[in-house]
Design a protein with these regions (language model features):
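C-terminal outer-membrane beta-barrel translocator/porin domains of Gram-negative envelope proteins
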Residues: 17, 23-24, 29-46, 55-56, ...
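Face-selective signature of the C-terminal outer-membrane beta-barrel domain
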Residues: 49, 58-76, 128-138
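Predominantly transmembrane beta-strands of Gram-negative outer membrane beta-barrel pores used
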Residues: 1-20
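Conserved NTP-handling cores and scaffolds of large molecular machines
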Residues: 9, 65, 77, 118, ...
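Short, solvent-exposed aromatic-acidic interface loops
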Residues: 76-78, 174
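Interface/linker segment at the passenger-translocator junction
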Residues: 1, 62, 80-82
Length: 217
């Protein structure tokens, strides 16, 4: 859940929010030990719980473009749903690589984002225009906080065909680095059709697709 306050009275919009949220994702299906089989999809389910607060500001450059700035402080906890898999994973990574897959600690992220939105919508979804979102996040090392940097870019273009048809283009790139780099995960109907939901995960990722869309009714 979350609690938020927003002030939209001026051109510079600002606000703050406190949150506690848990989401699930699928970890890579690697072998924990040489005697183990690869993780099944059910065994690879993990959860990420984040609790903290952020302050943010939104400044419109024009009708279709804006800048967003935010600063926050939160605690992140990640773990496998299956405790036996969690124990085996920690032992394997510690013995083989001396690293941890999951991040557990405090972060103090500072984020700057550019957003462009000219998309025209109909009752069935986007029809024409484009959407661009580019963000950079810096989580510095402050005392016992964990450090990371991330860049995330998402661009979409909708080319109208007739009254209701369109070609939809999308490209997205993500990269995170530092002592405790962030993950991105994607896959499924909304991003990569034909693949399992959230099938892909990593610190670096890129995908692009083109779709021909037209409503049947």
């Amino acid at each position: 859940g979350s609690f938020a306050y927003s002030n939209l009275s001026g051109r510079l919009q600002w606000g703050a929010q406190a949150f506690s949220q848990t989401q699930f994702f699928f970890t890579p299906g690697y072998s924990l030990y040489s005697s183990f089989d690869f993780l099944t999809r059910d065994q690879a389910v993990a959860t990420q719980t984040m609790r903290g607060a952020t302050v943010f500001g939104i400044y419109p450059i024009s009708r279709f473009r804006r800048l967003e700035l935010s600063a926050g402080f939160y605690h992140s906890s990640e773990n496998f749903d299956d405790p036996s898999v969690q124990t085996a994973n920690e032992a394997f990574l510690s013995n083989e690589f001396g690293v941890e897959l999951f991040r557990d600690g405090l972060f103090a992220p500072l984020t700057a984002t550019y957003v462009q939105e000219t998309t025209i919508f109909r009752e069935f979804g986007p029809l024409a225009g484009n959407t661009v979102r580019i963000s950079f996040t810096e989580s510095p090392k402050l005392g016992n906080t964990l450090s990371q940097r991330s860049v995330d870019a998402d661009a979409r273009y909708y080319f109208r065909l007739g009254d209701t048809g369109l070609l939809a283009f999308r490209a997205r790139g993500f990269k995170s680095w530092g002592d405790y780099p962030d993950f991105t995960f994607f896959g499924g109907n909304s991003e990569m059709r034909g693949y399992e939901y959230l099938e892909f995960i990593g610190h670096k990722a890129f995908f692009a697709n083109v779709e021909l869309r037209f409503p049947l009714v």
